[in-house]
């Protein structure tokens, strides 16, 4: 019988509801801090306020407060926005904080209990540079043992075992480092055995999605149980995107709400707008790919939460879906992308 493994236990796929497939509710993004431009240093070193928010929106990774997405203020703001997401029809959130991002399972479990939103926690490894020394030299076999334990046995949180429901996000740079190659191979091996979903994070070059999906597939992982994240900042050319789509994985646009004139994590490209994301998704729907499309926000900094002037986890439901309907996307197609596809990806047989 198909099931989905949440942090509070297994549920049947029909109970999942509208789902955000790539989010964070608490994590440490300080590794990506970038020194602020000299002209704006004083503003970006202050606490986030109406007086400094404009600078933070332009240089989000140059505010130390902004990338500390784990302190008490961040947790309170995150909780508020999860409740807003629930209020506006949200059913589930897939929490992608893996090893290297300091996931907070205790907080995730508490959110699931107190908000009524289903939470699915991930296992797996983020990029090599974010790992603790105890993880940096793990072999493929040790990684497969760890991921299997997280999914089958779980981790103790306040006296109860909390199980991961998928592997992700599994992240890499380009070219892929040896540690990251190990984590991709381990993800593929465990997926083949357990039938779980997997979420991959490519580096910010167009060759990266092809390379890491190939490694995962060669290890035995199934394409139809794998999500390629962050395509809206990685594959800009539609022909190249359609070529990648032939590999058979889920195609995820997960930076909805991120609209900026300067993308700090890759200044060589221009970040697309929500309108362009919608246009691309419609093109993919017209290519017959609606059964492989997913959407999310990848919230990982404070300034994207409503308490800090951001859009929150309900942005897609309240602002994007209405625009899609205006452009001719049908209710059935929206349900496919936001309900059916997430459930199919996350489901595995007992």
UniProtKB/Swiss-Prot annotation:
Protein name: Phosphotriesterase-related protein
Origin species: Drosophila grimshawi (Hawaiian fruit fly)
InterPro entries associated with the record: AryldialkylPase_Zn-BS, Metal_Hydrolase, Phosphotriesterase
Cofactor: a divalent metal cation
Cofactor binding mode and count: Binds 2 divalent metal cations per subunit.
Keyword annotations: Hydrolase, Metal-binding
EC number per UniProt: 3.1.-.-
Binding site for a divalent metal cation 2: 169, 201, 230
